[in-house]
């Protein structure tokens, strides 16, 4: 993870934008849609609490739109998502929840949902993580959420948890999604992999070659 973090820094993007884009790659691989939205959950601690010991729910949501182009190099997509996140932060008071409400005001989009969630706790104390972690009982009580990919760093190691609705995904598919995420992530120990197109990334032989080089 330390090597991957170094490469992320070299590209000039944040760890959160990188990891949520990896999720987009996985979803695109298993989906017939090349355009979709991920509901990004982040910690948004108000400035007046930054240096305090106050523990509370400071979560914020942002709807990230992805348009996956098969011949597009990954680093180009990554830079675009990074810029999109920066621009969205300028409107952080208008949260993803409020955007969803506005979308549903359209009669044709009344049932619109954004069921794929990415929860980033990077940079958050472990004691605070429980406030932004969507537990299994939360998923069972929130039918509009099908998946929550949660990431955090503990003792310099990246922890990834896929919280999936049991009635929405087969066990085989759930395992495949988690495995794809892990395999794709590990490929980025090689800085050159950021230059791969999405089509090349979805090539299992290409991925296996990179992973084999990593293990050598």
Give the location of each predicted region:
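Short amphipathic alpha-helical segments
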Residues: 2, 60, 64, 158-160
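Hydrophobic pocket-lining residues that define ligand/cofactor binding sites across diverse proteins
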Residues: 8, 27, 188
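N-lobe entry segment of adenylate-forming
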Residues: 182, 201-216
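His-Asp-centered acyl/peptidyl-transfer active-site segments
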Residues: 7-20, 30-136, 166-170, 194
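Extended, hydrophobic beta-loop-alpha segments that form or line the acyl/peptidyl-thioester binding
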Residues: 34-41, 69-78, 96, 139-202
């Amino acid at each position: 993870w330390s090597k991957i973090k170094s490469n992320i820094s070299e590209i000039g993007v944040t760890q959160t934008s990188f990891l949520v884009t990896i999720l987009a790659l996985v979803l695109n691989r298993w989906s017939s849609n090349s355009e979709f939205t991920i509901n990004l959950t982040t910690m948004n601690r108000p400035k007046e609490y930054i240096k305090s010991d106050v523990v509370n729910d400071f979560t914020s949501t942002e709807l990230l739109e992805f348009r996956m182009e098969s011949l597009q190099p990954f680093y180009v997509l990554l830079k675009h998502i990074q810029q999109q996140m920066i621009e969205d932060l300028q409107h952080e008071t208008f949260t993803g929840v409020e955007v969803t409400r506005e979308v549903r005001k359209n009669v044709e989009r009344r049932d619109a949902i954004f069921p794929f969630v990415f929860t980033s706790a990077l940079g958050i104390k472990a004691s605070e993580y429980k406030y932004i972690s969507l537990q299994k009982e939360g998923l069972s009580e929130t039918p509009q959420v099908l998946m929550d990919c949660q990431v955090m760093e503990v003792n310099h190691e990246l922890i990834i948890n896929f919280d999936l609705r049991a009635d929405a995904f087969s066990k085989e598919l759930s395992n495949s999604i988690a495995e794809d995420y892990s395999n794709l992530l590990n490929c980025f120990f090689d800085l050159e992999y950021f230059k791969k197109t999405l089509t090349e990334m979805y090539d299992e032989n290409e991925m296996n070659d990179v992973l084999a080089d990593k293990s050598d």
